[in-house]
Amino acid sequence: IYGDPKREYGEKAVTKIVEQWGINMDKVTLYDGSGLSRTNRMTPLFLASVLRSAALDWQTGDLFPTLLPRCGVDGTVRNLLKGTCLSGNIALKSGSMTGVRCYAGYYPAERPRYSVVLLTNNFHCTYEQLKSSIERLMVGMFESYQDTIDKRQNTPQL
């Protein structure tokens, strides 16, 4: 949007798009627009609103959700939810730095119905313990919905 790849241009570009979507930025601090700085601050509600708006936007709606890797299948989430009912059925972008692990994306991956955002800060366990807790949480949240989808797909249509 602004030409040269400078930090302040990334922040301006993200702010411009988010404001066009009418998303409240009161509790948000964007430093670089990429999410790579510890100075960035945002809430799960803000991220969920961005995901929802991107999925509903006529210019990005059909494309944007397909750009995210599928858990248990590819990208940095290829080992997350592997072997569960959500493997391949939830698309998430991961982000991490020391003491921080975040996931944001869509469920189901095909024709998204829900924005999914999970931010963890200052955790005091191993990554494997955190991953196990995150997997139990996500499976618990979406397992009954996934069962409903599976039953519909296996029911003969009249």
Residue map of PLM features:
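A small/polar active-site loop signature that marks catalytic segments
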Residues: 1-58, 62
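Short, contiguous acidic/charged loop-to-helix segments that flank catalytic cores in large enzymes
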Residues: 2, 37, 94-95, 123-128
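Active-site-proximal alpha-helical segments within enzyme catalytic domains
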Residues: 26, 38-60, 102-104, 108-121, ...
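Active-site-proximal beta-strand/loop segments in catalytic clefts of secreted hydrolases
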Residues: 31-33, 67-72, 94, 118-121
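Active/binding-pocket-proximal capping segment
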Residues: 61-75, 136
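Short, Gly/Ser/Thr-enriched beta-strand-loop segments that form substrate-interacting elements
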Residues: 79-110
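Short, gly/Ser/Thr-rich active-site loops of penicillin-recognizing serine hydrolases
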Residues: 133-158
